[in-house]
Amino acid sequence: MGDSTTAGTPGFLSPLEAPPDGRGDVESQYAYWMMKLHPEWLVLNRGINGQRSDEIRERLERDVLREGCDYAIILAGVNDLYQGRTLDSIEENLVAMHKRSIRAGIRTIAATVLPYNTMSQADYKSLAALNQWIRRVSHIMGTLFCDTSATVSDPDDPTKLASSPDGLHPDPSGYRKMGEALARVIEESQVRDFTE
């Protein structure tokens, strides 16, 4: 559940953007790589390019809760920051999506928001604060957590993506890293569930 980073921009249009199956390079979405690792999984791409957290929250019922999912990846907030929305408003929307999903019996994964290469230092400071909050609140709420930002950020400059075709989104290798990291989080949670 998310924005362009979930949809697979710029290489792929999600099924919500280009019904019924999406269009473009299927490798340009983390959902593809999760299913490549686990063919037994059905990972629904519910990303829409350009959406803010409030817009994503509005479609949670339709796009996640009615699908009967076991897990929901919630990755949102970069467009809010880009448009000058407050951290408080983003946090409120993220908490609401996690709470609503958990009440519906869905395990949620709180994913950190990715940087983009043209971010100002002030924007990056807000992004870093949001990602610290996401990590902290996932622990408090008992959700799963994935540091998706760390998987695709330049190790020498975390304000930028390591590899990007447009400076705003990961390339297929970045989406692959995201998919692998998210799959690992689910795998580990399933092992814990089995051993408890």
Predicted ranges, named:
Residues M1-R46, L60-G68:
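Serine-esterase "nucleophile elbow" of acetyl-processing enzymes
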Residues D21-R23, I48-R52, D123:
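Short, flexible loop segments at the rims of nucleotide/cofactor-binding pockets, characterized by
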Residues S28-P39, R52-E196:
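Alpha-helical cap/lid subdomain in secreted, periplasmic
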